């Protein structure tokens, strides 16, 4: 099993400071440009507090195992937590929620594009599938964060194919999966799987399972794609 690495993928990280020194401004001033404004008006300044919007809004969902029953329909206990659409909102939420290693066994924590529910029955998910990898208990925190950053930061070439991601905490392991829209689009699925492994520096093979195949609950279920 691959070990965790602390390097982050290119992603929607914390926003850089917009402040610049006067020496930098002078170096970048073109020849003949007037240095001082004699109009009496202060030059426009960038607002360092301005939010950094994401390309898509995303929603965190939580499936509480304590709210499940054996008779309940699958997915009936999933509840939306909060929707965010800026880098700042993401970090505010992420820094104030339990990370996978702190979740109870049986919990599922999702991050999906807004208005897409993390269910097979959702029309956008219905024809898709998921890439999945597993790791030991308590070892998924860093990989979950890197997955989120790569996803909301639009680092995937086929990002439009991605519905969202989920981390699932089980008795002996934790699983992270990326859900996609169209399982039949092999080029997109292979690209997403390969890039995901690169972002995580994950060396083991991962498999892609089609949702329609997973519904059959076949113990001999095989991966449609492997990278």
From Swiss-Prot:
GO MF term list: RNA 7-methylguanosine cap binding; RNA binding; translation initiation factor activity
One BP annotation, GO: defense response to virus
Region annotation (Disordered) ranges: 1-52
Residues binding mRNA: 70-75, 102, 120-121, 170-175, 215-219
Primary subcellular site in the record, as a coarse category: nucleus
Disulphide linkage map: 125-163
GO cellular component: cytoplasm; eukaryotic translation initiation factor 4F complex; nucleus
UniProt PTM: According to the redox status, the Cys-125-Cys-163 disulfide bridge may have a role in regulating protein function by affecting its ability to bind capped mRNA.
UniProt entry tagged with the keyword ATP-binding: no
Keywords carried by this UniProt record: Cytoplasm, Disulfide bond, Initiation factor, Nucleus, Protein biosynthesis, RNA-binding, Translation regulation
Residue ranges, annotated region (EIF4G-binding): 52-55, 62-98, 146-155
Keyword Disulfide bond annotated: yes
Record field: compositional bias (Low complexity): 9-20
Pfam families according to UniProt: IF4E (PF01652)
Ranges of compositional bias, category Acidic residues: 25-37
PANTHER family: EUKARYOTIC TRANSLATION INITIATION FACTOR 4E RELATED (PTHR11960), EUKARYOTIC TRANSLATION INITIATION FACTOR 4E1-RELATED (PTHR11960:SF8)
Binding partners and assembly: EIF4F is a multi-subunit complex, the composition of which varies with external and internal environmental conditions. It is composed of at least EIF4A, EIF4E and EIF4G. EIF4E is also known to interact with other partners. In higher plants two isoforms of EIF4F have been identified, named isoform EIF4F and isoform EIF(iso)4F. Isoform EIF4F has subunits p220 and p26, whereas isoform EIF(iso)4F has subunits p82 and p28.
Family the entry assigns: Belongs to the eukaryotic initiation factor 4E family.
Name of the protein described by the UniProt record: Eukaryotic translation initiation factor 4E-1
Taxonomic classification: Eukaryota, Viridiplantae, Streptophyta, Embryophyta, Tracheophyta
């Amino acid at each position: 099993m691959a070990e965790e690495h602390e390097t982050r993928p290119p992603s929607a990280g914390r926003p850089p400071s917009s402040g610049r020194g006067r020496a930098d401004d002078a170096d970048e001033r073109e020849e003949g440009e007037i240095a001082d404004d004699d109009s009496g008006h202060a030059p426009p300044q960038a607002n360092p507090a301005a939010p950094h919007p994401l390309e898509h809004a995303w929603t965190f969902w939580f499936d509480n195992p304590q709210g499940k029953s054996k008779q309940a329909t699958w997915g009936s206990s999933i509840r939306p937590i909060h929707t965010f659409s800026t880098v700042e909102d993401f970090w505010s939420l992420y820094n104030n929620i339990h990370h996978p290693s702190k979740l109870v066994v049986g919990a599922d924590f999702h991050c999906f594009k807004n208005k897409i529910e993390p269910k097979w029955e959702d029309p956008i998910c219905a024809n898709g599938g998921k890439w999945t990898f597993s790791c030991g208990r308590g070892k998924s925190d860093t990989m979950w964060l890197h997955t989120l950053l790569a996803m909301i930061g639009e680092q995937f070439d086929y990002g439009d194919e991605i519905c969202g991601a989920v981390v699932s905490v089980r008795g002996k392991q934790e699983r992270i999966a990326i859900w996609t829209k169209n399982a039949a689009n092999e080029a997109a699925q292979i690209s997403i799987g390969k890039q995901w492994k690169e972002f995580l520096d994950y060396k083991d093979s991962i498999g892609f399972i089609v949702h329609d195949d997973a519904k059959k609950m076949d113990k001999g279920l095989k991966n449609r794609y492997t990278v």
